[in-house]
Amino acid sequence: MNNDNKRSAGGLGLVGDIGGTNARFALWRGQRLESIEVLACADYPRPELAVRDYLARIGESVANIDSVCLACAGPVGAADFRFTNNHWVINRAAFREELGLDHLLLVNDFSTMAWAASRLGADELVQVRAGSAQADRARLIIGPGTGLGVGSLLPLGGGRWEVLPCEGGHVDLPVTSPRDFALWQGLQARYGHVSAERALSGNGLLALYEISCALDGVAVRASSAAEVGALAMAGDAQADAVLEHFFLWLARVAGNAVLTVGALGGVYITGGIVPRFLERFIASGFAEAFASRGKTSGAYLQDVPVWVMTAEHPGLLGAGVALQQALDAEG
């Protein structure tokens, strides 16, 4: 069915945010998300079957869907996409044919965080550093979670945006204090090259805690990043000091990225760690450390605002924005 016919028949967009364990789906109608559902990837041999089941659950016909955008964890190229943390494979041609689609767009999952940053409302953001965003400049999106995602969002005018994904999580971890250096040495002994992601991720938080305990002669009481965070929230001094150091390192890495990209449009923090410990993050030294550096670079960063993204489904929203812009570009 051609695009015009399907749209005249009430064609809808469908968006998905697919991780290793769960797949989140929603309809994209009138530039808004509707009918959000979460399905377990393990329950479906193929992603097409998950889409069909999602539509059946919400009482929507496959025939009414003309466009799909899926956020996928990993680098997205022109070839088939193989998920690294589950058994699914997306063959673009087969996927389009089975579901009768006119458009199929696959985007990197962290890129959707950047797309989402162009559309989030005030109730989906918490400002953690004051400043004045420049509307015509790039925005930086950074998110420690399973790894350390980094990307930027460029305004093109007319409400259009371009997302520039990168591998900023793999820059060298900056060392600016004796404690930094001691922790860095512990990371180097484990991994060799010490990227920012080695510290600023879930595994990184646990590694920093274990190394910190060894340096200070303190017994290790946590075996996961979640447990480190729980200890910190319960008042454990060692875990709390590690969480503080994590936030300070994030400030330096984010500040360096702003200097590199020229992201005077502001910084948006996402990922699974900072929003979980938002009150502790606000109370940390992040805001001061972000611009605490040399005279020239510190002045450049002084007025850059920082927000934490607290939207419940930013990946789905970002996929919807990416799909909408692609369709609008086609006319």
UniProtKB/Swiss-Prot annotation:
Keywords: ATP-binding, Cytoplasm, Glycolysis, Kinase, Nucleotide-binding, Transferase. It catalyses: D-glucose + ATP = D-glucose 6-phosphate + ADP + H(+). One of its GO terms (molecular function) is glucokinase activity. Its EC number is 2.7.1.2. It is found in: Cytoplasm. GO terms for cellular component: cytosol. Its main location: cytoplasm. Pfam families: Glucokinase. It is an enzyme of class 2 (transferase). Gene3D superfamilies: 3.30.420.40, 3.40.367.20. It comes from the Bacteria. Signal peptide: none annotated. The keyword Nucleotide-binding applies. ATP binds at residues 16-21. Belongs to the bacterial glucokinase family. This is Glucokinase. It comes from Pseudomonas aeruginosa (strain ATCC 15692 / DSM 22644 / CIP 104116 / JCM 14847 / LMG 12228 / 1C / PRS 101 / PAO1).
